[in-house]
């Protein structure tokens, strides 16, 4: 696994000579800013830098990005998962985005001086700690998967919280890798894994036709024989059809290729993409500044949304110094 950054310099520090790991927890809460802020604040650990966090009310989901030395990042992720288990009750909400837990997905990503296989070990350590501290069972996925069928995150989340809660009782093959056998009554389970860098990219259309955008999602997702390394779902967000995608292979499937394919498919339905957004951070190598897809991005500030620049100037943690 090649590194995204060879030298990582943090604000107020000359350099970070050791390995750098990124972690991008996804929490099943996107409407309550105080609750999400408390989860983010709980993740503050010496040696960990806050790179990005955002809330998405349409998907009822928040995404946090942190980076730092491996041991500290593991501790940060575990604290965030346990705080989420305290504050989020899945029995009182419905997730628009597929989810199985309050702290739904916690991936570890190699940035500098560390390999994907080592990140898989960190994921397993984090999973053990999450179960030990807050009794939320864990499914291991991606490069950390304990079983081949669980390398695919979609398979792990099949049925969502409501369906999985029943499945683990009836089917031993659906039970967690760590803890259990049942789910936490209100916080569900947590998928913890290791993966390469991923870009979350959403496209909005000049249409409210959900059937149309779901048809496009089926055609482009890798699982249906579409674009390599693409996961996609179609939803109605803010009164518009939205294609929500995870791009897991930026070298094999650059974002310009995704945008062209989506545009061609939309034209068949007499629709056009009118706006795009990146959730989280984008590596410098993925930027194509003269491309149509980048011109359509909203809220994209290169100083805050490009990984390498954010690593050099991390955010202040909520709650003050």
Task: Go through each PLM region and give its residues.
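Long, contiguous binding/interaction regions
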Residues: 17-321
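Cysteine-centered motifs
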Residues: 3-5
